[in-house]
Each structure stands twice: as C-alpha cells, then as structure tokens.
C-alpha cells in the first residue's frame, strides 16, 4: 500500500503531511512553501491556477479568482447571504438550493473548487514522495455538519483520492501535540482559530488514548473576519476623506483585503503599521492614493466584538465537559489567527493557571495530526486510540412537534442508536420521519436535517405497528437514519448529505435559547404531554363505551361525560393553566379506571385488553408521535382482577411479572417512592415504574 497523506483543507491555506519513520512531516509544495493558499484562479486563456500563483494574480483578476470556498461547501443558498456579499466572484444558486460559482460562463460547485486545491496538494505530495498518492485523511472543523463533511469527502473523491477518514481539526491538532506524550495524563484544550472557522475541543490524554470530552465552536469566525473589519475601516475612512466609495470596485476591494491581511500579520509583532496603496482609484481630478496608519490598539478596538465572540465556545466546552478552567493543564494554540496578541490575551485571562502551548506550528498542527491518524489507520502508529464526539444532539420530531432525542450531543462516535415507535392514529399507513438537530424541546426551534416517508404500513389500530428507527453516525461524523416496519420488513433510509449547514450564530443562538427558554420549553412540553394523554383518554373512553357501554351504570356514564366535557373545554381554551389541565386529566383518568373495573367485573374480562392498553397509553405520559413498544413478556395479574397482558407498559417499563414496583405519584395513601409488590394486594391506580 502506498503512502497515506494527511490534509488540512483550510479556508485560507491548506497543508499536507505524511508519516516518515513514525514521525509526521510537512510536505513542501512545488513553490517551496509549507502551506498552500486555498485559492483557485481562472485566467483569460482558460488556464487554471491554484495556490500561490492564483493569489498573485487575484488583484487584477478578482472576479475570476475563488477563495474561502470552504465557507460555502455543503451549505444552502439562503444560509450564505453574508458570505456571498463579501466575495468578488459571482455566486449562483446551484442544484438542491446549494451555492455554485460562475466563472467565465461555467458553473463550479464548492466541491469541484475544493477538489482543485486537493489535486494540487496530491500532485505536490507525489512529487515530494516520488510515488503515486491515492489515499488521504482530510480534516474538517469540529462543527461541520453532516452535509459539509459529506461534501468534503466528495471533493476528495473528485480529486482522485480515497478519503479513508474525515476527522475534526482540533482533534487532529491534539494528536500532533500528544503523540510523544502518551505516558502523560493531561487535560488539554485545543483552541483552533483559523482563516474561516473557530473550534474548541476539550480532551483527556493518557496511555495513548485521546478522548474528546466536549467540543464547541463557530463555523463563521476566523482570520477572514478580522481582515474584513480592517477592510471596512479603510473603505469608510477613504470615503470620508475622498468621497469615493471603494466597496463597489472589486479590484480595489481585493487590494484592500490583501493590505488588511498584511497589516494584521504585522501587528502581531509590531505596535504600528502603515498601509500604503498607491493608485487605489481615480476621479476627474486624477489618481487617488490610500495611506493610513493603523495601531495595534486600534486594530483591537475594530475587532473587539470578534474577540468577545471567542469566549462563548470556551465557556460552552467547559460546561459540556463539566470541567473548571483551573483543571485544564495546557491550551494548544492552532491556526494562524492565534498569533494575534489580543487572542492570546483572551485565552490567558480565561485560563490563568494553564500553559499556552506553541510547540507545534499553528499552521501545520492539524495536517500533522491528520498524518498521524493516517498512520493509525495504516498500522504504522500503534497504541493510539482516538475517541471523537458529535457536537449537537440528533433526533426526531414526534407527536405535537416535540423533539425526541436519539443521540445526545458530545456522544462518542462512531455510534448507533435505535428506538421502536408506533403510529399515532388508527389506520395510519405511512409515517414521516423528520430528522432534526439541536437542543430545544420543540422541533420547530431546532435545525431540520431532512425528511423521508415510510409507506406501506398495513392499517391497524394506533400503537400496534412497530417501527424501528435507527440513527448511525460513522467515524467520519456522517449520519444515516433508517426506519423499518417490523411487521412487513419494509425499510427506508436517508443519508444526510444535501442539507444546509448551521452557522456559528445559529449554533450559539440555539444553545443560548435552550438555556434561556428552558422553563418555557418544559411548560410547552408538559402541555403537549397532557394534550396527548387527554387524546388517549378520549379514545379509550369512547372505545370502552362502544364495546361494553351496557355494563356501565348510568350514573358512572354521566360522571364520565361530565369529566370528558370539562377536559375538552379546557383543551380548547387558550392559556389554560397546566395545573388545572393536569387535574382534569387525572380526574378523567380515574373515572375511566372505575368504568374499566366495572366493565370487567360485570363482563368477566370483556374489557381487559382495552383497559391494559389504557394503562399503557396514559400512565407513561408519552409525548411521542409514535409510542415506544415492547412485547413477548409474561403476563401479570393484580388482585383486583385486572389482567396486564404481555407487553403492557407502566410508565414506559414492561411488566415482567413478580417485580417490585415503586409509585411515582403520591396518591391513594402511598408515599412517593413507597414500594409494594405488584402481584400482591394492590390495584394499579397511578403511574408506577420498575425498580431493581
């Protein structure tokens, strides 16, 4: 097998590396550089330039030079309004509502542009190694969505590379840092601020295991944004002085952008810098020149909000990992933007007791880590285990627009989880599976990833069909969701690969809202649960009276109708207090219990199945579109004569027979938590759950 290279496909610069003698080394490109600008230029003669050559001609050919394509890959058109306004090249709407780039009459997808950069890295690697290169490990930001990861993998395939693994950039950097420190037990935080993305990962290192405890970040915060602050300042200052708006001149903006990047770099080692751009534009009076002084303090003031934005993911990562800042041994600085003194100051203030680690070149650390992971896959590196995580919770929309989480955020990947659901209404022959991502209780407040339909379910009473929904995240962080009707064996699945990405702002907004509106979400969730319980009670009440109404006393029927009407009115009345609704639901439930008991006693078992279904459907308080089912367990019988049929659940737990149960609601004289033997002398009146 040939060499497997590691590639850091960055927003502004890319880097390739390879393992030689068990150690990762950076592959220099044909121009002699250790990193390659992630830029593609198209000349008038249809020649394609990549890297440094493309960057050199970008000022005079701005409309046909593509940079920062990573900010568009795997994202939807409507999600990229701000990014499209910042680039001089022509963005057009592509297939499936994605973003494409139109150059000289031809359209290119972000995957194709990225593939051109990867082809350059592949060719440079082959020249460096003297042998063909066909396999690679490629890194992506930790907060890249499934669609963005899949699109990056597709770019590798277009470039002629077999992508063995997609790994997170901060995790790769941790590998580069910790390879020769495998005997050391350390808690490290990787602070990765690159050209277009920002990631924070908290890792536990020890005995060759690199375990990611939590990850956070912002997919749209990086060096480009610092440059844009300076560009806007220069354009506004020039407009005030000369009354000329440079923002409409694409060539001028490209020159401002290059000057801003140069000034930013110089201010990392100097307190002042001069920006001098002769002949930036012209008017009737002649050519105009731009000359400005920029101090480091002024630069920090211009980028003040960006500096503050880096604090939010830091706090989130520590909170998710349940770690205090003082417990972090080292902070690994990754990405060229970590050279900004103000950034280092923010980190040092956040972690006053931690050492800032600069032993690995920030521009090269991610690529070096990718090469190490390639060595692990190829067997060259032993005794190294990488345990990464998924950054956001994944789940389904269930009955009442409720979010049912299947995989929680910060779950170690690869992973797979399954749950069994059922239908919500009688005779339902299809189920729509709506996959969502986020932390809010209600589905509409989260990010929709995709939908698919499982059809052909035989008509049956609600709650009877069993539909197994499986979520599977592979080692690349790419999600596959499948649903199977266990009765017919029919199956449908979806790979999340054509969805728009989450912006950093969306992610932080989702998390902040999840905290800010936690109480409100819980109230809405409880209201939805009560509505679902009421619906189930109505169904049981009507069915029982239809089938066995002649066995029920008129007095009891009248009480039942009264309680039913009161509950129905409360449900239709806006802003009914949850406490009142809860009381009415409980009162109606008790009436139905009395009706069921009377039917059974009069009819000798006529309503046993319906009554068991009632206990199953209402005691659990389920809010799912499709209620969890379990089957094929032994029946139990209570002394009251109520038979719990096989598979009957109480509060979501299947009754196996002969178990002790504990009451979850303090009613009927039993204290909350008081034990009793289900098979002995008790009648089931409320919610109970199994205990060990």
Swiss-Prot record:
One of its GO terms (molecular function) is ATP-dependent protein folding chaperone. The modification Phosphothreonine is found at residue 197. Keywords: ATP-binding, Chaperone, Nucleotide-binding, Phosphoprotein, Stress response. PROSITE patterns: HSP70_1, HSP70_2, HSP70_3. One of its GO terms (biological process) is chaperone cofactor-dependent protein refolding. InterPro entries: ATPase_NBD (IPR043129), Chaperone_DnaK (IPR012725), Heat_shock_70_CS (IPR018181), HSP70_peptide-bd_sf (IPR029047), Hsp_70_fam (IPR013126). CDD domains: ASKHA_NBD_HSP70_DnaK-like (cd10234). The keyword Flavoprotein does not apply. Acts as a chaperone. NCBIfam families: PRK00290.1 (NF001413), PRK13411.1 (NF009947), prok_dnaK (TIGR02350). Belongs to the heat shock protein 70 family. This is Chaperone protein dnaK1. It comes from Synechocystis sp. (strain ATCC 27184 / PCC 6803 / Kazusa). The lineage of its organism: Bacteria, Bacillati, Cyanobacteriota, Cyanophyceae, Synechococcales. The gene is dnaK1.
